[in-house]
Amino acid sequence: MNKKQLNTISNKLVNAFTKNKLIKPIPTKFCKNIKNSNLLRRTCESKIRWPIIGFKAGGTALPLLKKLKEKEPFYGSVYSKNLLRSGKRVKINQYVLGIELEVCYLIKKNFFLSKQKISKNNITKFITHMAPCLEIVGYRQRKKGVKYLGDLCSDFGANIKFLIGKKTKFKKINIGNLNTYVKNNKNKEITNGNTSAVYINPLNSLIFVLKKIKRDKINLNKNFYI
C-alpha cells in the first residue's frame, strides 16, 4: 500500500474524529480489503493522543459477517472522550447508522501480565464489573450503508459514542440468550433483539477482543472496558 496515501487518508480521518467533522468518503481500497482497513485503523489510532479506556468488537452480528463474506469481526480502541454516562445527550448526523444495545465488561489490568491462553474457563477471573451500554454507530464520512466490513473498521470502528449504564459486580450468569429491546421515548418505537446476536454471546465477543489485544502486545497498565 502507498504509505503517502495511507498517511494522507489517516490524517483526514483523525482530523474528522478529533474535531467532529465530516469528510468525503475515503477510497474504496481501504474498505474492500479488511487487512487494509485494519492497517488504516491502527494508523489512525496511533495519531490520537486521547486516553484509551478500552476496546470494542465490531461487526459481531453473524448474519452481517455471512453477508459480507468475512470470517471474523474486528476490534478497535475506545477513547475517554467517546464514553458518556447514561442520561447524557449525543449530537448525531444523517450518517449515523444506528444505535446498538451492548454489554460491556470492566477488565482487571493484571490481564496484561497473564501468560495464560484466554478461554471461557479462565476469562471470568479477569472481570470485575459489567454494565449495559448503548453504542451510537456511524461514520465521519458522507456515506451511508455498509458494503464492506472495512467500511466500519477503517473509520475508528464506526464508533461515535458509548453511553454506559450503572456498573454491577460481575456474576456468572447466563446472558447468552436474553431478549432485549431499545425504546424511542419520543415516537414509542421499539426495536427488539437478543444477546445471542453478538458473536454467539457477549462473553465470546469479549474473548475475541482479549485474544486480539494480547496478540498485538497492547498494555494499558490499568483496568479497561470491553
Residue spans of the language-model regions?
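Catalytic-core "active-site belt" of small-molecule-metabolizing enzymes
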Residues: 2-201, 207, 215
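A conserved acidic, glycine/proline-rich C-terminal tail/linker
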Residues: 202-226
